[in-house]
Amino acid sequence: SFAMTPEARALANNFASNKGALPWPVERGIITGKFGKHPHPIVKGVIVDNPHIEITTEENAIVRSVFEGEVSSVVPIPGANVMVLVRHGNYFTVYSNLINVKVKAGDMVSLKEPIGTAFTDEEGKTMVQLGIWKDADIQDPNPWLAK
């Protein structure tokens, strides 16, 4: 680990001070998958441990960065289409289940800048996963988002 530059520290402080006020990554949606450990909604006796929340949204929904930052990586994930990682100082936001990704590693993104499109499966369900990390610690994204 290395010391943050003054700019990165300022960005991290800004990110942290916006807890509870971050915009949602999509304009319309509902949280259909909770963060953390909870019983599987269908399979009895199975515990799900989600490192993110799942937001169900409308078809062709544009997924936007919830804060300004730098795209750290764009990675194809088997079964989750493409994942985009955006760095905000020592905070990261992770967006997965994206298609038509508009950004690449090294790009600077602004607040609410489109980064891709939420994927729609064969059953017509459109969903994006949002994760928030502080260094290596996974955060529950729900309290970070504006209500």
Predicted regions and their residues:
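Extracytoplasmic/periplasmic cell wall- or extracellular glycan-interacting regions that localize
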Residues: S1-S73, P78-N81, R87, Q129, ...
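Conserved beta-strand positions that form and line the central face of beta-propeller blades
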Residues: E54, L85, V94-N97, T117
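Short histidine-centered loop motifs in beta-beta connectors
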Residues: V74, N90-M108, K112
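Residue-level structural signal for beta-strand termini and adjacent loop
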Residues: I77, L98-I99, T120, W144
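Conserved, short, structured surface segments that act as functional micro-motifs
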Residues: V84, A105-K147
